[in-house]
Amino acid sequence: MRWFADPTVGAVAGNAKVGNRINMITRWQALEYVTSQNLERRALAALGCITVVPGAIGAWKREALERLGGFPLDTLAEDQDLTIAMLTAGYTVLYDSSAIGWTEAPDTVEGLIKQRFRWAYGTLQCLWKYRTG
């Protein structure tokens, strides 16, 4: 893992793509992953503030992960939680567009709503957990 030769790097986000493009719902998500998630991640990487290393395609430096106590169990968005913990601890989080991981997207409206509710609720949990002041 070339990225982890740098002692400041704690995690690397990869390029998540939808593999099951089987209907309008999954095709829409495939487009969304390209435009929203991956373009946004490139911009956040340029600013040095990636907020989520996706569970589908992410690499974590073992020493950093152990220092932070492993994967958190108290939020629904453990990937986002751990990413924020890495940044808070002073680690750098990078993005590698050539590291591609295929994920299975929800293929029903009900499944999509459940996923997005989980993501939104998990984000709110992380905001509360890492609030300051």
Give the label of every model feature segment.
Residues K129-G133:
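Hydrophobic helical membrane-anchoring modules
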Residues G55, Y95-D96, W102-K114:
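Catalytic cores of eukaryotic secretory-pathway lumenal/extracellular enzymes that build
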Residues L44-G48, S97, T108:
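Short amphipathic alpha-helical segments at helix-loop
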Residues I25, T83, V93, V109-E110:
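Internal amphipathic alpha-helical segments of the cytochrome P450 catalytic fold
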Residues D74, T83-G101:
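Catalytic donor-sugar/metal-binding loop of nucleotide-sugar-dependent glycosyltransferases
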Residues M1-L76, I113, F117-W128:
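Long helical/loop segments within the catalytic core of UDP-sugar-dependent glycosyltransferases
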Residues I22, A46, T83, T103-A105:
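Short secondary-structure boundary/hinge segments and terminal tails
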